[in-house]
Structures are given as C-alpha cells and as structure tokens.
Amino acid sequence: MKKTDTIIIGAGPVGLFAVHQLGIKGLKSIVIDNLDKAGGQCIELYPDKPIYDIPAVPECTGEELTKKLLEQIKPFNTEFFLNERVEEVKQDKENWIVKTNNKNEFLAPNIIIAGGVGSFEPRKLSVKEAENFEGTSLFYAVRNKEQ
C-alpha cells in the first residue's frame, strides 16, 4: 500500500493544478488517471483546440496547457499511476483508501476527486471483427495529427 499526503483522482488540468498547490504547501500527492497520459480531455480530445478561459492567458491549446502544468509541477516529484481506473474509495478513521483495477492500494488523509466529466471511452464500432483493425487502420483518437 502506497502512503502519501493526498490522493488525486484525475490527471486533467484541475488535478495537475491541485498537485501544484499542494506542493507549494509541502504536501506530497499521488495522481491516478484512467488515461495513458496526463492532461485529461485537453490532451486526449482536443490538443490543438484553442482555449480562451484560463486566467491571465488569452489563448493556448490543450497541449500547451498540459505541457505548462506538467512543467510547473516537476519540482514536486509527483508519482503518476496512469492507465488505472479507481475501483473503490473508502474511509477508515483517519485516512482514505483507494483501490484501482491494477490492484494498487493507496492511503492518504486527504483525497481530491478531479475527474472532470468523468472517465470516458470511445464509442466503438459495432462491426464484426473491427477490433482486429484497432491501432493499425482504425483509430478512436487522434494521436498524431501529422499521420
């Protein structure tokens, strides 16, 4: 079981900003996210889309925002557990216990749920044998806009 000061569920912009704010106060955190990389929807669904509602930043893309947030939290040496889905959250007398689908268990007195709109998955084609083409000629997300 991994122990920390705060467990953050969600590695999107809010989860990453929470790491920063906790780090400033000297608190360590662990971040858990269902996606394979930090950034949430900003990086997964619209990395090139302009974002206009960040205070003091007139415009940036989802990818730029994610890169800046990750750069900002580097000094705090945060441990990320990506490709992990939270299966159970329970509280004992003084701590939260979080269990994931990868059988990892985390213990902390504080928890932040920064899941945005929640875990999302593509609506896959209901075509026979479509899964045989996933990742080669059938894609559900843009991973490289140059391809």
What are these language model-derived features?
Residues 36, 49, 119:
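Alpha/beta-hydrolase active-site loop signature
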Residues 1-9, 25, 80-147:
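FAD-binding core/adjacent interface of flavoenzyme oxidoreductases
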Residues 36, 59, 143:
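Short, acidic/turn-prone active-site loops that include or flank metal/cofactor-
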Residues 7-9, 23-45:
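Glycine-rich FAD pyrophosphate-binding loop
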Residues 10-14:
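Glycine-rich Rossmann-fold phosphate-binding loop(s) that bind the pyrophosphate
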Residues 22, 44-48, 125-129:
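Short, glycine/charged-enriched secondary-structure capping and boundary segments
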